[in-house]
C-alpha cells in the first residue's frame, strides 16, 4: 500500500490558483522555497520564525478526550461547499438519527468558512454569504442541541483552501475561538514557511506548540486536533512529530486524507486501505487520551459497498481511532446509519482501556487484529483486504486471550454468539471484516463456532473444480449436516446439494464440485459461489453457516480505447452543453483538462502528438466522454515489437507501478511506470518528460487556475528486443491515467 497515490482531493472551487493538497503533504513541506517563504511573510506583514526558533510550549495539553472523539465534519463529503444551513442540518440529523446519543457529539466546520482577509483588527471574519449569522451563532445552535462546536484553522500563512491561516495570529485566533465558545479545534498544516537553516520539524513544533499554549491561556477546554504529522508521513522525522503532537494536543492526523465524495469506488476503497495501513503500525505512539487519527468515516457516501463501510468502522474501532463521520447525514441510508450507530462496535472504539489494537497475524491479503478491552475481553478483527472471498483462521492464543477450553465469540455485526474451543475462523467476503468480541469462558446451549472453507483444486478458463469443507470449531458435534451450493444465473454446477452427515467437534466434512460459467467479457469479472450448511448441534438446536468463493476472470481488452473509464477532458461551456465542465473527473475532485486549453497547446481529439521522436495518437473521444484509463491492473491487447513501450499520461497524485508485457512466445518483461502530477511539479518525476502544457483546467464550476500549467507527459518501459507483444498489463495504481500507448 505504500506506493498508493496521494490523490489531490482539495476542491478547486472558489480558487484562482491551486494550493497544496492535503495528500502528499511531506512533498509540499520540503518544496517550499526560501523565496516563497520570504514573499509570504512580506505579503502578509507577518513576523516569521527567527533563525533559531524558540522552544515550543512544554506544558502538556490536558486530557480532554479520555476516549476517542466522535462527531461529524463536512470536508470529505462537501469540501468547500458548506454553509450555516448545511452544518446545522447535519447537526439536527445527528440528533434525530440517534447518533448523537451514541457519542457522535462534535460538529466541526472544516476549511472555507471564512472570508479571504481578516478585518481591520486582524480578526478572522466568517463568510457572510455562507454563514450569515456568524460562527458564534453556529456554536450557540449546536450547544442548544446538546452538541459541541468544532472549527478549522491552519498553522500556516493560509489554509489549504487559500483562506487566512493562524500564522502570526495564534493567540488572537485562540481568544476568538474561546469567545465563540468553540469546543474543538482542528489545526491543519498547509503553507507553513520553513526558512533556510531551520528544520520543518522544529518549525511545525514551535507553531503547534504556540497554539497549544494559546488555547490553554484562554481557560476554555478546547479539544486540540493536530495535523502536523500528516505533513511528514513516511519521512524520517514522522514518528518524532507524532511524539510531540501527543504533548501539545489530544489527537493528530498523521497521514493522507481519505477520498472525497466525488472519488471513484476504487479510489475510496483504496484510500480506506491506505489510511488503515499507515495507521495500524503506530500503536506504540498512542496512549489513553492521545489518539492516532486516520481520518473520516465514509459510511453514507456513494459507491462504497456495505462490506466496505463495515470494514472501515470495524478497523477504526479496533485501532481506537476517532469516529468522525463525513457524509450528508440528512440523506444517509438506513444501512449507513446502522453502521455508524452499531453500539457494540462503538463500545470497542470507546473502551476505557484506551489501547490501539495490533496486528497479531498476517497472510496474503488479510490481517488479524486484536485489541485488549477493559473487562478482559478481546476485540478480534478478521480483515480481508483482497478482492476475493476467503476463510481467515486464527486462535484465541494468538489473539492474546488466556489459556482455556472454551471461548464465546460474539459477531458484532450479525449479533450471533457461538462457542469455540480455541479456533477463531470465518469466511470473509472481499473487502469485508468480521469483528468478534471474544470472552474466555463457556455457556450452555450456545451454537458451536463453524466455518466454511472453499479450496480451488483445478480447472481452467470458465471451468473450475472445488473442495468445500464445513469445520466444527466448537465443543458440540453436528448431525444431519446438509450443504447447498448456489451460483449466478448462467453458471452450471456438478452438484448443488450434498449430505455431509455427522461432523465431530474439532473435525470437518468435505464435498467436491465442478463449476462452469459463460465466457467472460473484457476486463475483470468476479463471480461469487455461495455454500450454506445447515445442521443440528445437540442441545443448542439447529444452526447454519455460509461461505463464499470468488472466481476472478481476467480477459484482455481488445484495445486501450475499449478500456477507457475516465473523463479527463471537458469543454469550457456551462451546463447543459454537451461535454461541459461538470462532466469530468480526472483528479477525484471533479476537475479535468480543458479541451480548449489543450487545443491551444496542439492537442485535439484524434491528433498526432509528438515529443523527442515519439508519436502518439491522442484519443478521438469527444470532450465529456471517457478518453483515458484510470489504472486498475487492466490487460490490453497490443501488437508490435521494438525497444520501448511509450505511454502518454499524467497523474492525480504521486505513484508508480509495474507494467507487465506478455509476448507471443509466452515470455514476459516488466518495467516501472509513473508520471508527475498533472500540475505544479518539476515534470521530470519517474523519468518522465513533458509532452504538452495547457494554460488552465476546468473545475466543477468552470475554467480556473489560468496561468498554471496542466501537463501531459511521456514515459516508457523497456521491451525485449526481437519479440512481438501480445498483451500489456497496466499497474494497479488509480492515480495514474494513460491516454495513449505506442511502440518505438
What residue ranges belong to the model's regions?
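C-terminal beta-strand-rich structural cap/linker in extracellular carbohydrate-active enzymes
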Residues: 420-448
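Glycan-recognition surfaces
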Residues: 169-172, 221-328, 349
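Secretory targeting and sorting signals
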Residues: 4-6, 13-56
